Amino acid sequence: SSVVRLEKLLDEHAPGALLVKHEQNLGKGGAVISGLEAARAAGYSHAIQVDADGQHDPKALESIHGQSCIYPDRIICGQPVFDENISRVRYYFRFLTTYLAWAETLSTEIKDALCGLRAYPLDAVLKLVRGGGRRLRMDFDPEILVRAVWADIPLHYVSVHVSYPVDGTSHFQYIRDNFYISWMHTRLLFGMLPRSPVLLARKVKRMLGRPRP
């Protein structure tokens, strides 16, 4: 099974690492949340999320970690630099998702809503999860950033080279996950409406020269 293979890899390359197991597949968001909660329970203040499909340049991990040390209160997000293998459908879907995130936050703070390489300040992000951001599927990545902007948690971006191998494996289920993401955008657009006075006031303050501390 995949768990047995993971245990062997950890024993070989990272002895002492904690592997969080579940009886059933909870989805990407469920796996990330479980990892964040386990890291906090173990006494860590921050955790790094990285997709398991090999699309992100592992050299970027050092930059993500370094920026998290410099800006410990911020979510450090990968900003993809794509190679020529990205399909037009995938590219425009990412752009549409990010564009909708701008509408949901009344800002352009979110540069890329889908990149799965990030460093999270655990207390702040787990508070968002408990406050309604507990999304268990592929909708976790964009929704947690939208909720972070709503909560005025700053974001910081690091360029990450992203490559999609021609014979690579994707865990994205087009029908199911597109349904979850479409429903997520509907919820967030309606969730933005009662928050819009605060979001607009914050935007005006920054336009008048009162930057984020």
Question: How should each PLM-predicted stretch be described?
Answer:
Residues S1-V20:
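Acidic donor-binding segment of Leloir-type glycosyltransferases
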Residues S1-V4, D51-Q67:
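Acidic donor-binding/catalytic loop of UDP-sugar-dependent glycosyltransferases
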Residues D11, C69, V149:
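Anion (oxyanion) recognition and catalysis
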Residues P15, G43-Y44, P72, D152-P154:
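Short loop/turn motifs at secondary-structure junctions
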Residues G16-L18, E109, P154-H156:
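Conserved beta-strand segments of alpha/beta enzyme cores
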Residues H22-Q24, K28-A41, H46, P58-M138, ...:
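Acceptor/aglycone-binding surface of glycosyltransferases and processive sugar-polymer synthases
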Residues S45-V50, V158:
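Short beta-strand segments at enzyme active-site cores
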Residues G131-P213:
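Hydrophobic helical membrane-anchoring modules
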